[in-house]
Swiss-Prot record:
Protein name (database record): Putative pyruvate formate-lyase 3-activating enzyme
PROSITE patterns, per the entry: RADICAL_ACTIVATING, RADICAL_SAM
Keywords noted in UniProt: 4Fe-4S, Cytoplasm, Iron, Iron-sulfur, Metal-binding, Oxidoreductase, S-adenosyl-L-methionine
Binding, [4Fe-4S] cluster: 25, 29, 32
Record gene name: ybiY
Gene3D superfamilies noted in UniProt: Aldolase class I
Subcellular location: Cytoplasm
GO molecular function list: 4 iron, 4 sulfur cluster binding; [formate-C-acetyltransferase]-activating enzyme activity; metal ion binding
Cofactor binding summary note: Binds 1 [4Fe-4S] cluster. The cluster is coordinated with 3 cysteines and an exchangeable S-adenosyl-L-methionine.
Organism: Escherichia coli (strain K12)
Length: 299
């Protein structure tokens, strides 16, 4: 299941790329900018700003899951079925109710990917799998990567690597570049902020490096979590000394995804303001350069 295909991307690997976003993630990062990607199933998004006062179409279409409330709709999400999702989106005249998640075959996705092959060839671009976590759907990920390789298309995967190694290993021959998150090297803060296990990520990174795969490390910098010199040094040291990568990207925290939490009726448990730490960003770049890495800041 996917939730988006983005063509003409220039920020998810080299050149012009098509990014396929797969649903499902094994982490629960507090700052996640794509909360609609976490579940492997479809999600219902509700935008109260588009809801028409006095309209009862959705409540009539699915009275067991929709109730009118003072400030819009009360949705009993735990009761939603695929049939409800279809009925609700079909009846809503303003698209206040929309569904995130679509089942597509490898052939359907590749039809879209192949349309832009001339642009990939000219720019050094290709296909990027993102998410969510692409390796939460290992068979689909491998099929798309293999089909792209057979078509002569460069492949990249944006991944948190918080999955069993057996989900990753079969796809290795078909992956040209890993855009790998390295959020923290210490297990306690990693667990607190992502509900995950840092050791699993570090172990998978070491295995990728041992396999000779090209890796670009990506570091989201979040105040209160890892936006400090000690954490930045530890992450950079691991990337340089343990993985021997050549490139690291620092991604300052932003709040562009907050509205998605409202649409999903989810709490937002991350800082409410973007990271404002120019001195830290300067330090991160300078320290990475001292360690022999090419460092880039990405917004």
């Amino acid at each position: 299941m996917i939730f988006n295909i983005q063509r003409y991307s220039t920020h998810d690997g080299p050149g012009i790329r098509t990014v396929v976003f797969l649903k499902g993630c094994s982490l629960g990062c507090r700052w996640c900018q794509n909360p609609e990607s976490r579940a492997r199933t479809q999600d219902l998004l509700y935008d109260a700003r588009l809801c028409l006062e006095g309209c009862e179409l959705c409540a009539k279409a699915a009275p067991e899951v929709i109730e009118r409330a003072l400030n819009g709709l009360l949705i009993h999400r735990e009761k939603l079925t695929p049939e409800h999702l279809t009925a609700l989106t079909d009846c809503c005249p303003t698209q206040a109710l929309t569904v995130c998640g679509e089942v597509k075959s490898v052939e359907e996705i590749m039809t879209t990917v192949l349309r832009d092959k001339p642009f990939y060839d000219r720019s050094g671009g290709g296909l990027t799998l993102s998410g969510g976590e692409p390796f939460m759907q290992p068979e689909m990920a491998m099929a798309l990567l293999q089909a792209s390789h057979e078509a002569g298309i460069h492949t990249a995967v944006e991944t948190c690597l918080h999955v069993p190694w057996k989900y990753i290993a079969p796809s290795l021959p078909y992956i040209d570049l890993f855009l790998a998150d390295l959020k923290h090297v210490a297990d306690a803060p990693f667990k607190q902020w992502t509900d995950g296990n840092a050791a699993r990520v570090l172990d998978n990174l070491k295995k990728l490096a041992a396999a000779g795969k090209k890796i670009i490390i990506r570091v989201p910098l979040i105040q209160g979590f890892n936006a400090d010199e000690t954490s930045v040094k530890a992450i950079t040291d691991f990337a340089a000394d343990e993985l021997h990568v050549g490139e690291i990207h620092f991604l300052p925290y932003h709040t562009l995804g907050i509205n998605k939490y409202h649409l999903l009726n989810l709490p937002y448990d991350a800082p409410e303001k973007p990271l404002d730490a120019p001195e830290l960003l300067d330090f991160a770049q300078q320290y990475a350069c001292q360690k022999g890495l090419t460092a880039t800041l990405r917004g």
